């Protein structure tokens, strides 16, 4: 996973006024997300297929009922010919069951069980992707809210400075150009504030859309203690995180199931070399209109029972080809599993590296901000006393604004990187 925490896709919610926690947003999204719901449908279909594979062990029973009508030419005592009709009713009941087919039926059940497990892991993977998107969008809203607060504070401070500059201009203590510099700065910061407010609205809409929740202006989220989250770094290296991920990540489980299914498919193919043994049973009867029906049914009753063996002598190399394809299927599945493991390892390594880099960047941003705030405080005092012109003062203010922005970005990038580590370790995403 990359640390591009500011990118995401989104989903909608409900119109009740409440404060939504990250857990609330995730739970709602998992209930409403179309892909998750489609995964549920696939699971239901898979369950039907599994049950059918199990039911194939039992005998099949069929019944038939037929009515035959015929005519024949007859000559009476006067030598005249005519056609006489007759009818016959036949009924039969038959059943057959495969007693042995090279263990193919049992292996087909095992394969259906593997397929069902694969669908379960596929659903889990879909849910994890939705959860990750929601978490990313949620953090984006928190980031946008802080950006609005910072922009508003900056504009308020500049508004006070403009009032002070106006007083000093009236006293002739500063030039009109200095006053206009501060006024221009305020206008710029008000534009920045407007943009920040718009970005917050967009971030909220994005989150609601990801949740499949109708857009609601009253939608509000809970604000966790971000500082406490980043105060405790996850004590994990790439190797340990990878080992934990191997045990919990659904894509790994799915790849393992696919390999096992391919191995079972080989067993099914080998079963084609074995003879198959079937048991057949049936009974039939019939009657015509020429005699009483009850006696005919009794006298015409004909039960049957038989065993049949089918021995594959030569089938145009179909069994040989099936076995060969199954072996290659195992090789392909094993390579897919290896590729999935390697991909997971690379993602974990990148996530751990991102977390380490984010930690270093955050510390640097904190140091930059602390130095900038000290410099700004000194510059502000000088500006109020008239010992610094507006140009030099606004330079320090711009530096502080930049430091605040860098710190805010570094903080949320660090939070995201920590949560990604939790994600790979199988720890539920929450604040």
Where are these regions (language model features)?
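Bacterial Sec-pathway N-terminal export signals of envelope proteins
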Residues: 15-62, 66, 215, 222-260, ...
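Small/polar, glycine/serine/threonine/aspartate-rich low-complexity segments that form flexible
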Residues: 17-18, 64-97, 224-234, 267, ...
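Sec/SRP-type N-terminal targeting helices
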Residues: 37-41, 54-55, 85, 99-127, ...
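Short segments within alpha-helical structural elements
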Residues: 41, 55, 191-213, 369-427
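Periplasmic alpha-helical coiled-coil/stalk elements that build and connect Gram-negative outer-membrane
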Residues: 123, 129-244, 354, 358, ...
